[in-house]
Amino acid sequence: MSVNSPVRPVMAADILARKGGEPLVCLTAYTTPMARLVDAHCDITLVGDSLGMVVHGLPTTLGVTMEMMILHGKAVARGTSRAMLVIDMPFGSYEESPAQAFANARRLMAETGCAAVKLEGGRHMAGTIRFLVERGIPVMAHVGLTPQAVNALGGYKVQGRGADADRVMEDAIAVAEAGAFSVVLEKVPDGLSQRITQRVAIPTIGIGASAHCDGQVLVLDDMLGLFTDFRPKFVKRYGELGTAADEAIAAYAAEVRARRFPASEHVFPDELKGKQP
């Protein structure tokens, strides 16, 4: 391969092959500049419907539309060359029927160039996952806390404690057997997450789950300290970009009001020194 050959992007088969190996690294991204940063370090870039909350200021993910996912999906695709690009299917775009799910998944892939879609739900979505996979659409599943079902679940609660553990385990087994290439475990207790990881043949990707999952995912704006409306227990802040941005904007505003910006090096003289071009 020559030095100028394009980098082969990560694909579903590559993710499957990582089961039980080095942990998979996944982050969300919503813009081209951030996608470039994520692409340099991660195996999977997820255009999550969390964009509704962290980018558009919505109270939940329920108001996210296909058009929003496509807009941000295109932007992230422009900044992604190596990582596997996965896009969330928004609420209402896949639950009605497998045919509806296929039509919208096909649209996401065709218009953004993503490599896979992600959808929420366990046993009740297994038939839809199988329908998509049989028609050439790789699917990342999502069980445990499924934010699109927040109203039915009674809030953003941990899923799978006590007698509820069997339900979450059965959901994970069902989506794996349906052909999903990986499954996100969200807000699932540590021990149960480990048992699911040992039980299913596909990689588990934890968010508020266990360090023993096959990979981890976080919302980029959470881990960078950009989204500060609330902070889930499972989020570790690896930066405080929100604070840094606030300080930078405050400094800019102060300099403008004091007429210290723009300074001489930021403006153009009336005449050029020396020979005219």
Curated annotation (Swiss-Prot):
For this protein, what is the EC number? 2.1.2.11
Subcellular locations according to the entry: Cytoplasm
Pathway field of the UniProt record reads:
Cofactor biosynthesis; (R)-pantothenate biosynthesis; (R)-pantoate from 3-methyl-2-oxobutanoate: step 1/2
Q: Which UniProt keywords apply?
A: Cytoplasm, Magnesium, Metal-binding, Pantothenate biosynthesis, Transferase
The EC class name is transferase
The source's domain of life comes to Bacteria
Active-site residues, record numbering mapped to chain: 186
Cofactor, how bound (note): Binds 1 Mg(2+) ion per subunit.
Identify this protein by name: 3-methyl-2-oxobutanoate hydroxymethyltransferase
At the highest ranks, the source species' classification is: Bacteria, Pseudomonadati, Pseudomonadota, Alphaproteobacteria, Rhodobacterales
Q: Name the gene for this chain.
A: panB
